[in-house]
């Protein structure tokens, strides 16, 4: 048996260690996971009852059109119901786009480092991947434009970008879209949209009226706290979605996910509270970094990338031994950094305390070695 040649250059996704495994390995009673950009406050209390109401119908297929959720979400965003496509997480919408647009002989343009699933799915489809290094943590849009040619089919903009948390502002995005050829789809991935505080962040939905070659991705996994249920969506012109719908699997979002997302959407107070707490949490980390002279990017997401100036794996291991799970930057293209999900105020205090102790221990060790 022979699998696709391009699969041989890919590795399957490696999830972090489960909390229970970390407890056993390090003999810990409590473990804080701040590695996957999940919502530390969970989801809206409305979700639990919505899921419970679906349990008697688990033998029935879900609504393949997601009509109830579709109507509510379209009204919430202010668009037509036909401008939405749903996926088993926004990851699946990325997969659908790659399946629909990319093949051998085409290419796709993206930043690096960024969300890895753009590259992963493009390679599976046999497309050439053109990666443009970030410029001081931000998308280098001019260089991305220069990488586009007649064979380019999709350009990816992750804003806020994972793992840096930086964003593309309104003026920059408009200028970029004005120069992108009409045959190229521009995908703006807004997985962390609900956390954004920047005043010059673009109203991407309104831009769809002017740029028909644009698609927006959002998710219920982050601020809405439904990561376990896997549901995300794309927003675009009706004719674009009609063209790619055949690449979507039928019944790709479960009835539990649809019901949970519908309920979560009703509770915008919860979302606003989470966004405000996240802002306060980022301020905790900014203050810590400023005190110790650590480099970081101002983040519009629910995470922060901090450069410690030495191996991110070392920081990761130090914290793991103390019951705190973060993401080493070595796996993200930033070998001297770690990415930390913003937790509750108490969780943030715990990790900042641990990081402070780590820096003091390294300083004391350095002083002894140089004495």
UniProtKB/Swiss-Prot annotation:
Which Enzyme Commission number(s) are listed?
2.6.1.9
Its recorded reaction(s) are: L-histidinol phosphate + 2-oxoglutarate = 3-(imidazol-4-yl)-2-oxopropyl phosphate + L-glutamate
Which residues in this protein are found as N6-(pyridoxal phosphate)lysine? 222
Q: Which cofactor does the UniProt annotation name? A: pyridoxal 5'-phosphate
Q: By its UniProt entry, which Pfam families does this protein fall under?
A: Aminotran_1_2
List the pathway annotation: Amino-acid biosynthesis; L-histidine biosynthesis; L-histidine from 5-phospho-alpha-D-ribose 1-diphosphate: step 7/9
- Please list the GO terms describing molecular function: histidinol-phosphate transaminase activity; pyridoxal phosphate binding
UniProt keyword list: Amino-acid biosynthesis, Aminotransferase, Histidine biosynthesis, Pyridoxal phosphate, Transferase
Q: Which PROSITE patterns match?
A: AA_TRANSFER_CLASS_2
Family under the similarity heading: Belongs to the class-II pyridoxal-phosphate-dependent aminotransferase family. Histidinol-phosphate aminotransferase subfamily.
Subunit annotation: Homodimer.
Please report the name of this protein according to its UniProt entry: Histidinol-phosphate aminotransferase
**What species is given as this protein's source?**
Anoxybacillus flavithermus (strain DSM 21510 / WK1)
């Amino acid at each position: 048996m022979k699998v696709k040649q391009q699969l041989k250059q890919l590795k399957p996704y490696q999830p972090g260690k489960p909390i229970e495994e970390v407890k056993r390995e390090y003999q810990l009673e409590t473990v804080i996971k701040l590695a996957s950009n999940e919502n530390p406050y969970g989801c809206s209390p409305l979700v639990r009852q919505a899921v419970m109401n679906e349990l008697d119908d688990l033998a029935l297929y879900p609504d393949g059109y997601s009509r109830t959720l579709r109507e509510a979400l379209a009204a919430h965003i202010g668009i037509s119901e036909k401008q939405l496509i749903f996926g088993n997480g926004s990851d699946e919408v990325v997969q659908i786009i790659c399946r629909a647009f990319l093949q051998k002989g085409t290419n796709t343009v993206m930043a690096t480092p960024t969300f890895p699933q753009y590259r992963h799915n493009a390679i599976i489809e046999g497309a050439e991947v053109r990666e443009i290094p970030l410029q001081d943590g931000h998308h280098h849009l001019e260089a991305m434009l220069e990488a586009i040619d007649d064979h380019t089919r999709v350009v990816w903009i992750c804003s806020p970008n994972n793992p840096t948390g930086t964003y593309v502002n309104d003026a920059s995005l408009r200028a970029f879209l004005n120069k992108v050829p009409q045959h190229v789809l521009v995908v703006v991935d807004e997985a962390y949209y609900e956390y954004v505080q920047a005043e010059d962040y673009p109203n991407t939905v309104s831009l769809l009226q002017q740029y028909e070659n644009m698609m927006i991705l959002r998710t219920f996994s982050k601020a809405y706290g439904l990561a376990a249920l896997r549901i995300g969506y794309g927003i675009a012109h009706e004719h674009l979605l009609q063209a790619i719908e055949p690449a979507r699997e039928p019944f790709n979002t479960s009835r539990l996910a649809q019901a949970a997302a519908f309920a979560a959407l009703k509770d915008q107070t919860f979302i606003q509270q989470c966004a405000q707490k996240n802002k306060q949490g980022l301020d905790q980390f900014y203050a810590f970094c400023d005190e110790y002279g650590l480099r970081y990017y101002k983040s519009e997401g629910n995470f922060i990338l901090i450069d410690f100036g030495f191996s991110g794996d070392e920081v990761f291991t130090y914290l793991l031994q103390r019951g705190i799970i973060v993401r080493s930057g070595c796996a993200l293209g930033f070998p001297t950094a770690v990415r930390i999900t913003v937790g509750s105020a108490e969780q943030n205090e715990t990790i900042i305390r641990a990081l402070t102790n780590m820096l003091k221990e390294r300083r004391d060790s350095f002083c002894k070695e140089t004495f």
